[in-house]
From Swiss-Prot:
Native source species: Merluccius productus (North Pacific hake)
Binding site for Ca(2+) 2: 81
Residues recorded as bearing N-acetylalanine in the entry: 1
Protein name, as recorded: Parvalbumin beta 3
Keyword annotations: Acetylation, Allergen, Calcium, Metal-binding, Muscle protein
Lineage of source species: Eukaryota, Metazoa, Chordata, Craniata, Vertebrata
Gene Ontology CC entries for this record: cytoplasm
PANTHER family, sorted: PARVALBUMIN, PARVALBUMIN ALPHA
Length: 88
């Protein structure tokens, strides 16, 4: 799903950069608002306009088998909330 969007080196750097809770630096990872929307669309597999909990779990497991568990109690986020979360 990330072919043409992320290079292998970028994926490895992102995984290394977010190994600990609250350590992912989104300000340097996403290069533009369009890129944020691309990532959202990839994760939102049912195209509902929201990333539900199961979609996020599936994405994290696909992205990295060793991905840490989410600590947020919310069960879905919309594209605007996702963009705000990764930009702010």
């Amino acid at each position: 799903a990330f072919a043409g969007v992320l290079a292998d080196a970028d994926i490895k750097a992102a995984l290394a950069g977010c190994a600990a809770a609250d350590s992912f630096n989104y300000k340097t990872f996403f290069k533009s608002p369009e890129e944020v929307k691309k990532f959202f669309a990839i994760i939102d597999q049912d195209h509902s306009g929201f990333i539900e909990e199961e979609e996020l779990k599936l994405f994290l497991q696909t992205f990295s088998a060793g991905a840490r568990a989410l600590s947020d109690a919310e069960t879905k986020i919309g594209v605007d909330e996702f963009a705000t979360m990764v930009k702010x």
